[in-house]
Amino acid sequence: MKRIKSGDEVIVIAGKSKGHIGKVLRVVDDAVVVEGGNLIKKHIKPNPQKPENKGGIIAREAPLHVSNVAHYNPVTKKADKVGFKYLESNGVSKKVRYYKSNNEIIDRI
């Protein structure tokens, strides 16, 4: 089980977007794409075969390494470490993630 999943709220702790809080749009190997974070300008060449592609300069999110982001705890309003523990429900134990500062569970059971 990975510490950061798609849909988690994270804070950028290093880089040009340091301090930015946003949702994880997708996870790619050891990199994450954060909504509104690490924006780059991409130059698009016009393509006459595709009328929707007019070309120009667009801003989009670039991936960040997972070591440069941390989970954002909405209760403490700070970056937080994530731990794993097993919870039992209906006789089946399930591995869940939780915030280490206040033991609040991140995953839904």
From Swiss-Prot:
GO molecular function annotations of the record: rRNA binding; structural constituent of ribosome
InterPro entries: KOW, Rib_uL2_dom2, Ribosomal_uL24, Ribosomal_uL24_CS, Ribosomal_uL24_KOW, Translation_prot_SH3-like_sf
Gene Ontology cellular component annotations, sorted alphabetically: ribonucleoprotein complex; ribosome
Pfam families: KOW (PF00467), ribosomal_L24 (PF17136)
Record's keyword terms, sorted: Ribonucleoprotein, Ribosomal protein, RNA-binding, rRNA-binding
Keyword Transmembrane annotated: no
PROSITE patterns reported for this sequence: RIBOSOMAL_L24
Gene3D superfamilies: 2.30.30.30
GO biological process, one term: translation
Subunit structure: Part of the 50S ribosomal subunit.
Function, as annotated: One of two assembly initiator proteins, it binds directly to the 5'-end of the 23S rRNA, where it nucleates assembly of the 50S subunit.
Family to which the UniProt record says this protein belongs: Belongs to the universal ribosomal protein uL24 family.
Protein name: Large ribosomal subunit protein uL24
Organism whose genome encodes this protein: Legionella pneumophila (strain Paris)
